[in-house]
């Protein structure tokens, strides 16, 4: 339990309904979202629900040295990284975003990853502010005009 009446579950994408209204903005913003979603049905997602309705989602991916970053406009050397593939939080539950970034950080530590990154468009001002408050810095652009933000993991 994260907050009153909010339940966090881990589910594979194949157990989610892509037609749920929660996904509409992702489908509208990323024209290939449905294709991407259907190609990753075994990937796990962290989901919060309130009254059986999705209120947030976090999808992570551990990348390795075989990853291709040719669409980045600045060198991004292949390395073991944690990518935040999808992070969407219903506006009424913004605090969950902070919890998800903590979860991503802990996942990076658990998997011996030195860097986390996320790509997003500049219209996501609240998310950019949240990232910057949590030690993410702007790194570069992608060819599709998304911005790349990174967080270097400090190990003690």
Predicted segments — roles?
Residues 108-122:
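Conserved GNAT acetyl-CoA-binding A-motif
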Residues 85-95, 121:
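A short, internal acetyl-CoA/4′-phosphopantetheine-binding micro-motif in the GNAT/acyltransferase core
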Residues 119-120, 135-150:
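Conserved catalytic-core motifs of GNAT/GCN5-like acyltransferases
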Residues 43-48, 57, 86:
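Short hydrophobic/aromatic beta-strand element in the GNAT-like acyltransferase core
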Residues 1-40, 45-47:
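Short amphipathic alpha-helix that is part of the acyltransferase structural core
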Residues 53-83:
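Conserved acyl-donor/pantetheine-binding loop and adjacent beta-alpha core of acyl/acetyltransferases
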Residues 94-108, 133:
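Conserved acetyl-CoA-binding loop-helix of GNAT-fold acetyltransferases
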Residues 127-136:
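Conserved active-site tyrosine of GNAT-family acetyltransferases
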């Amino acid at each position: 339990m994260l907050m009153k009446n909010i339940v966090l579950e881990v589910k594979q994408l194949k157990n989610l309904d892509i037609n749920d209204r929660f996904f509409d903005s992702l489908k509208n913003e990323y024209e290939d979202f449905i294709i991407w979603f259907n190609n990753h049905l075994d990937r796990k997602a962290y989901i919060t629900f309130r009254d059986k309705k999705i209120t947030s989602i976090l999808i992570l991916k551990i990348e390795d040295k075989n990853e291709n970053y040719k669409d980045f406009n600045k060198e991004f050397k292949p390395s073991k990284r944690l990518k935040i593939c999808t992070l969407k939080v219903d506006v009424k539950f913004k605090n969950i975003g902070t919890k998800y970034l903590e979860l991503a950080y802990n996942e990076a530590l658990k998997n011996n990853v030195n860097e986390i990154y996320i790509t997003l468009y500049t219209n996501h001002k609240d998310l950019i502010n949240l990232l910057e408050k949590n030690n993410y810095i702007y790194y570069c652009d992608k060819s599709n005009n998304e911005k790349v933000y990174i967080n270097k993991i400090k190990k003690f």
